[in-house]
Regions:
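Membrane-interface coil-to-helix junctions
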Residues: 11-105, 125-147, 241-242, 247, ...
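Membrane-interface anchor segments at the N-terminal boundary of transmembrane helices
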Residues: 281-302, 408-414, 646, 652
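Hydrophobic alpha-helical membrane-insertion signals
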Residues: 2-65, 237-246, 302, 467, ...
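Active-site-proximal, structured, solvent-exposed surfaces of multi-pass membrane proteins
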Residues: 302, 328, 556, 568, ...
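Extracytoplasmic
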Residues: 414, 446, 450, 454-644, ...
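Contiguous transmembrane helix-bundle modules in multi-pass membrane proteins
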Residues: 139-147, 159-172, 176, 186, ...
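Membrane-embedded helix bundles of polyisoprenyl
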Residues: 10-13, 103-112, 117-203, 217-236, ...
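Selective detector of the "anchor" transmembrane alpha-helix that sits immediately C-terminal
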Residues: 8, 96-108, 112, 295-309, ...
């Protein structure tokens, strides 16, 4: 009954937090959520409604892989909510479910570790409403991966404790789900942390055989989870072969978003404003960096600091080490020893942003909140702790809050000072027996809830859902462009090239990004953009090269690149932006520049030139080259040009993962389709399979003879068939596991020695 009450309280907490999203027509916006999360989930939802798997999207970089890119989470199990007809409601439910799952399994994990009822609730609330989780929500996949750590821990530790096959299967499924959440660095950190935790708490009685069994069982769970996930991982691995990341990233790129030392101030204080558009409280301020706040609660900081007096407790000592190690690694380039770490740890160069290491510190803070609270209560009641260490910690934290607040005026310190005084006064009363333990612990829980609700979750920016539902003016003006010409939004004339305008996280900035239909916001409105964000396509080489070509070219060169990329419409961001009656910026249709001489989506050419890789791109964008007369290929073909050539493209039509082109011509020539060339595309000409040639560096061509032709292009990702077979094989193994001989149950001691032994002292 107590556990049901605890889980009900966590449900009510999550319900309270998400009430505006579920019942008041609010939606999350800002940063990645605005121009990545919502457009990608919307596209996925529309594909599900059509009953197809979205292998490909035409809405960025002249078409790019969608499913294999990993980030969209096509096979991520919670994505089933996107079968709901209301995409915004589905997204809000999607996040509500994740918050609820996070809090529930933090509670269950606390129970497994022997924490008291209130300590479990304090840890769970800290995890659900922490600044890390709020900040990670705006980066989507980072948040989705983080949620699964307590589930992976709980499942595997329950298996270790009870040796029930059901918990082992649960471990496999939890690891697989976290893997499919598409943040591999989080998955790796979770497994490394779990393995380290098991080693730390391994009893001497288990000996070497116990180490071997633990290593083998966790290793087997990982192998089975990766096997089940192969339907996603195999095509993603095939896509990686075309990525600039396949050989690893340089130290400079890898450490681009390191945790800045000044950001550590948000461990103590965090901005106090409400980020809600239309509330009048939106200040236009955004904390820079990968995570805009690290705040875990002022009481969490109290417990972390007090934890050093209990470091002989095995659990507290472990999580203190993890907390410090996570911050040390998160500093990245600001850590003088990090470059040695970068060169020493295998595969680390494949990932970006050392700030992500704060993930382990955040969960360490969550667990320390519960462990230290119980240790403090235990030692206080048994008088194994004097009042002076706690008072000293509180005085030092009060001084730290004042110092940070005075030096960082945008970080409000008033509430933190009040909470510290209330906690200190209550602890003194509890220490001298003036209030009962239940009163003190209940007050601690309430302080944590109020503190995190005031300071952290209110930083999750909300806006009315009409922000996403109302079409930009330019989207209506471009409604006939789909399948014919692409759109480009960004500077051309300026020497400082930028595809995103304005480079701001303010409310006006977000509204302008939507009005300008910048990548990938136009995905929602059926806009096919010639550009995009190369990082979301896993740094596909051709995408990076296209962006680099635009950056390096002069104004005339950029115009030529756009026209030869089938860009018929350029949205010019320069000039003043008028405001509507609500004070929101509106971009009028006169901002659209029409390129009447842009290449059509598909056309026929009579001639062919061969180009070397080193000259291919320069030749295509050269002013002297006429793309309507010749196609540039890198491989020789048997081709006899006709004395007379005439032809036209009769029709170009698109369906998901499919393009149909109908042509008629006299003489031999080539169809050029200005859609991205990518392995996985196949074509039939009049029902007979033919070869797709890589044309003009980026696009596709098919050699055709005289007559009328129907070309059917289909996309099926490389490695998907093999991945399906592997996933099916490992899934059958998992299903068969319960039929195998039961595991011999060997009772193990509790994984965490809590409460502390009587002889233990701070």
């Amino acid at each position: 009954l107590q556990d049901l009450l605890g889980l009900l309280l966590l449900f009510l907490m999550a319900f309270y937090v998400f009430y505006p999203l579920l019942f008041k027509n609010k939606a999350i916006f800002l940063r990645d959520y605005h121009f990545i999360t919502y457009p990608f989930r919307y596209f996925l939802s529309q594909a599900f409604h059509q009953g197809i798997i979205p292998y490909w999207t035409p809405h960025g970089f002249s078409g790019m892989p969608f499913m294999a890119a990993f980030h969209p989470g096509v096979f991520y199990p919670p994505s089933v909510v996107f079968f709901l007809p209301d995409t915004l409601l589905a997204i809000n439910l999607f996040y509500f479910i994740h918050f609820l799952v996070l809090g529930s399994f933090l509670y269950l994990l606390g129970k497994l570790w022997g924490l008291s009822f209130v300590a479990r609730l304090c840890s769970s609330v800290t995890g659900m409403l922490s600044g890390f989780i709020v900040a990670a929500t705006l980066t989507s996949n980072f948040f989705l991966g983080a949620v699964w750590l307590p589930i992976v821990f709980w499942m595997y530790l329950k298996y270790r404790q009870e040796k029930r096959i059901g918990y082992f299967i649960g471990t496999v499924l939890a690891i697989a789900t976290q893997t499919l959440a598409a943040c591999p660095e989080i998955s790796i950190m979770t497994l490394v942390l779990l393995y380290a935790h098991c080693l730390w708490f391994m009893s001497k009685e288990e000996g070497r055989a116990g180490y071997a069994r633990m290593t083998a069982s966790l290793g087997l769970a990982v192998v089975l989870a990766l096997g089940i996930s192969a339907l996603q991982l195999w095509p993603t691995a095939a896509l990686m072969e075309h990525s600039t990341r396949s050989g690893g990233m340089s130290y400079e790129i890898h450490t681009m978003w390191s945790l800045e030392p000044h950001t550590l101030a948000t461990l103590v204080l965090t901005p106090v404003y409400i980020v809600e558009a239309g509330s009048g409280a939106y200040p236009g301020f955004f904390w820079g960096g990968f995570l805009h706040t690290l705040y875990m609660g002022i009481l969490s900081l109290v417990f972390i600091s007090t934890g050093f007096f209990f470091c002989r407790n095995k659990a507290i000592g472990f999580w203190l080490l993890v907390f410090l190690l996570g911050i040390w690694l998160a500093l990245g380039r600001n850590n003088p020893l990090y470059e040695y770490v970068y060169h020493s740890i295998p595969l680390l160069e494949l990932f970006r942003f050392p700030a992500k290491f704060f993930f382990v510190s955040s969960f360490a803070a969550v667990f320390l909140t519960g462990f230290v609270l119980d240790a403090l209560l235990n030692h206080t009641e048994k008088r194994r702790l004097t009042i002076y260490p706690v008072v000293t910690v509180l005085i030092l934290l009060l001084a730290l809050v004042v110092w940070v607040g005075l030096n960082q005026p945008y970080l409000g310190m008033e509430n933190s000072l009040i909470f510290l005084f209330i906690f200190g006064f209550a602890y003194i009363l509890f220490y001298f027996g003036k209030i009962r333990k239940i009163v003190f612990t209940t007050l601690v829980l309430l302080l944590i809830i109020v503190d995190l609700n005031l300071k952290d979750f209110r930083l999750l920016p909300l806006i009315d859902r009409k922000f996403y539902e109302e079409r930009p003016v330019l989207a209506d003006a471009l409604k006939d462009a789909y399948g014919k010409h692409r759109v480009y939004s960004g500077r051309i004339q300026q020497s400082s090239f930028s595809t995103l305008l304005p480079a701001s996280n303010s409310l006006d900035g977000m509204l302008l990004l939507k009005q300008y239909l910048t990548p990938f916001t136009g995905m929602v409105y059926g806009i096919e953009n010639a550009s995009g964000k190369a990082g979301l396509g896993m740094g596909i080489s051709k995408q990076v090269i296209w962006v680099a070509a635009m950056k390096q070219a002069d104004a005339d060169g950029r115009l030529r690149i756009l026209k030869r990329s089938n860009v018929g419409y350029w949205i010019d961001p320069n000039g003043e932006n008028p405001l509507d009656s609500n004070g929101d910026p509106v971009i009028s249709p006169d901002r659209i520049r029409v390129f009447k001489d842009a290449l059509p989506r598909a056309y026929l050419v009579p001639g062919v030139w061969l180009a070397k890789d080193s000259q291919w791109l320069n030749a295509y964008y050269a002013e002297a080259f006429d793309p309507l007369q010749h196609v540039l290929l890198s491989e020789p073909v048997e081709f006899a040009p006709s004395n007379h050539f005439e032809g036209k493209v009769e029709e170009v039509s698109y369906r998901p993962n499919h393009v149909t082109v109908k042509t008629s011509q006299e003489g031999t020539g080539f169809l050029v389709l200005v859609d991205s060339y990518f392995p996985g595309w196949t074509v039939t000409v009049d029902g007979k399979e033919e070869k797709i040639l890589r044309a003009n560096y980026f696009y596709r061509a098919v050699q055709l003879g005289p007559g009328e032709h129907t070309l059917e292009f289909d996309y099926f990702p490389e490695g998907f068939k093999e991945g399906l077979i592997v996933s099916a094989f490992f899934l059958l193994i998992l299903i068969a596991l319960p039929l195998c001989k039961p595991f011999k149950r060997v009772p193990l001691p509790r994984s965490v020695p809590f409460p502390p032994d009587p002889g233990e002292s701070p």
